[in-house]
Amino acid sequence: MNKKICFFCVGTGGHVLPVKNLVIELENLGVNPREIYVISDVRGVQYLENLNINIFTTNAYISKNGILGYILNFPKIINTIYEVKKFLKNQNIAVVFTTGAYIAPIAAIISLLLNAKFYIQEQNVYAGLGNKISAIFAKSVFSSFEDTKNINKKKLNYTGPIVNTTLTRSDISLFEKQTIGFMGGSQGSKQINNYVDKFMETEYQLNFNIVHVTGKNNDKLEINSKNYRSVDFIEEMDEFYR
């Protein structure tokens, strides 16, 4: 039996789309999609509908009270681990990969139970609680920013963000007008916002709509374009990805 890979991603497109991009890339490299497994939640699976892979939907506990929340709801976490372990049993999973969020600690534990190599992708300058905890067990943490904080530097491997390499300008030109979304609302906002400023200076004549989440307490860009709209924060991120 061939060794297989399992991705853990939950929530909105920010955590799930990178996994989708990786799955597409693996398929292009010749990996059988039936040897790829994804653990996600109800929100996450909607971004994976067109992929012919093995998907398991779980309702992992979300802590709004840091580590204390996880401690108080430990039975729920154990139940999720049991369900996922049962799904992956006898599948010969060799690699576990997570894009973070509240599923990351569960991914770390599953990797230990399966004796699989564990990897993390960190999308922010400051790692979230899930990735901070899980990084202890990770073989490597792939970062989107060169100066990622609060994770052991020995484990960091700067790769940049995970993007869709199959998307070309010819694909975009098939549609009359596209909307580009820039997410500057998390850690790393300043770097992303500076990039948007430079992007608009060089690409302002393109037939694009721009939606830019700047993040709270960040300076607004003075961009004079009818196609550009900025907001501090978006409550429902699913709406942003639609």
Protein language model annotation of sequence segments:
Residues 2-10, 27-76:
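Conserved nucleotide-sugar phosphate-binding/catalytic loop shared by glycosyltransferases and other
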Residues 4, 37, 43, 113-170:
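Active-site-proximal region of nucleotide-activated glycan assembly enzymes
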Residues 15-29:
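Short amphipathic alpha-helix
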Residues 37-39, 43-45, 51, 172-242:
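Donor-nucleotide binding loops and adjacent catalytic segments primarily
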Residues 43-46, 95-114:
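An aromatic- and histidine-rich active-site surface loop
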Residues 57-62, 99, 121-124, 144:
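Short beta->alpha connector loops at strand-helix junctions that form conserved
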Residues 66-95, 113:
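An amphipathic, basic-hydrophobic alpha-helix
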